[in-house]
């Protein structure tokens, strides 16, 4: 019989790994999937509003436009007001097409306008494109 802690561990692993495992399976036939790690530096006092915009609008709009949301994080000691997240795409071309569609989506434009009525949320965005190594579980 499994102990309570083992059951909780198994449930947590299933919850956190299933989106990634599903994406990896779906992408198995793709030749060159691309990952993008994006770091947003929020303006002072704006991180909560930025997180709310992602929670309430951006994540769903990314999905709508063909982007795979891998995960979203903030540093434990977040002195720089950072949000870090990873998106995945079948190719670099698909990424560009998805972001173009996302940017022109009226729902995004409305959410952006509403969230910035008291000032811009983000002062800097840094992004980097990644591809899996031959020994990575996610490629």
Regions found by a protein language model. Give the residues of each.
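A short beta-turn/loop motif at secondary-structure boundaries
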Residues: 73-80, 118-120
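Short, flexible turn/loop "capping" segments at secondary-structure junctions
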Residues: 30-34, 77-79
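Short, surface-exposed ligand-recognition loops at beta-strand->loop->(often short) alpha-helix junctions
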Residues: 42-52
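Boundary at the C-terminal end of the N-terminal hydrophobic targeting segment
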Residues: 24-28
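Bacterial N-terminal signal peptides that target proteins for export
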Residues: 1-12, 20-21
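Acidic/histidine-enriched, glycine/proline-rich intrinsically disordered or flexible terminal extensions
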Residues: 131-139
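Active-site-flanking beta-strand signature of metal-NTP-handling nucleotidyl enzymes
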Residues: 35-39, 84
């Amino acid at each position: 019989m499994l102990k309570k802690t083992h059951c909780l561990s198994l449930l947590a692993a299933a919850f956190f790994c299933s989106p990634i495992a599903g994406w990896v399976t779906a992408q198995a036939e793709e030749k060159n999937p691309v990952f993008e790690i994006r770091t947003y530096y929020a303006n002072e006092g704006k991180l909560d509003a930025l997180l709310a915009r992602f929670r309430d609008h951006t994540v769903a709009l990314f999905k709508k436009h063909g982007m795979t949301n891998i995960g979203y994080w903030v540093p434990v000691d977040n002195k720089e007001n950072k949000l870090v997240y990873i998106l995945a795409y079948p190719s670099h071309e698909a990424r560009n097409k998805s972001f173009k569609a996302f940017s022109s989506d009226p729902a995004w434009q409305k959410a952006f306008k509403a969230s910035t009525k008291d000032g811009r949320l983000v002062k800097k965005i840094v992004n980097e494109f990644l591809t899996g190594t031959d020994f990575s579980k996610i490629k």
